[in-house]
């Protein structure tokens, strides 16, 4: 269940299309603080870059609205989103891992939970447990649309099947099953290596057929 955050060592890499709930694959976590009052958790949402992370829900409560922490979680939760992991975006929380948590090319969220109250009378919403049912909503990967590729018969534009830097999110096209299908056939690469999808060379795909699909 992609809405239940957990650690699964053989979890397949996630490919996310359209506007939907992302994967919640816990890749690492650790406690810090004198009394281990902070829990740090890294959740990888997709094995590729994505367009946006718009909302995060814990169970049925909005925890983050795309800009700031909400409701009872204010003062007890920090959220850092990364649409494409790089060395420069790595979060350093302790000497154990330093800046080695890069999740290169992937989309991830870093959570810091404060497990203790901010005063003697206050209680953290995470004092008894940290929610595992997490809904991370957003817009998925940029897609390739042959209608916007002038090298394909019937297409017009600068998008290219063999250059994913030209792919883009579109509110209509990126939710089109035909556009999603051809993007999945092409696959997404990180540093030149196939991360998700089939990785079929464009010359072996009838791109024109996806214009009329």
Language-model region placement:
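Polar, S/T/G-rich
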Residues: 1-213
């Amino acid at each position: 269940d992609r809405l239940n955050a957990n650690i699964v060592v053989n979890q397949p890499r996630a490919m996310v299309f359209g506007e939907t709930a992302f994967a919640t694959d816990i890749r690492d976590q650790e406690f810090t603080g004198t009394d281990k009052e902070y829990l740090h958790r890294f959740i990888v949402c997709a094995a590729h870059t994505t367009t946006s992370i718009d909302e995060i829900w814990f169970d049925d409560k909005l925890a983050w609205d795309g800009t700031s922490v909400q409701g009872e979680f204010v003062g007890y939760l920090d959220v850092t989103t990364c649409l494409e992991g790089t060395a420069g975006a790595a979060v350093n929380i302790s000497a154990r891992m330093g800046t080695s948590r890069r999740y290169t090319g992937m989309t991830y969220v870093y959570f810091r939970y404060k497990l203790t109250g901010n005063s003697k009378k206050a209680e953290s919403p995470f004092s008894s447990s940290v929610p595992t049912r997490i809904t991370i909503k957003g817009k998925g990967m940029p897609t390739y649309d042959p209608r916007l590729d002038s090298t394909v018969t019937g297409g017009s534009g600068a998008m290219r099947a063999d250059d994913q830097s030209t792919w883009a999110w579109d509110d209509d096209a990126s939710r089109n099953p035909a556009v999603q299908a051809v993007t999945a056939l092409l696959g997404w690469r990180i540093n030149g290596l196939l991360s998700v999808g089939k990785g079929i060379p464009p010359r072996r795909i009838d791109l024109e057929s996806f214009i009329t699909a």
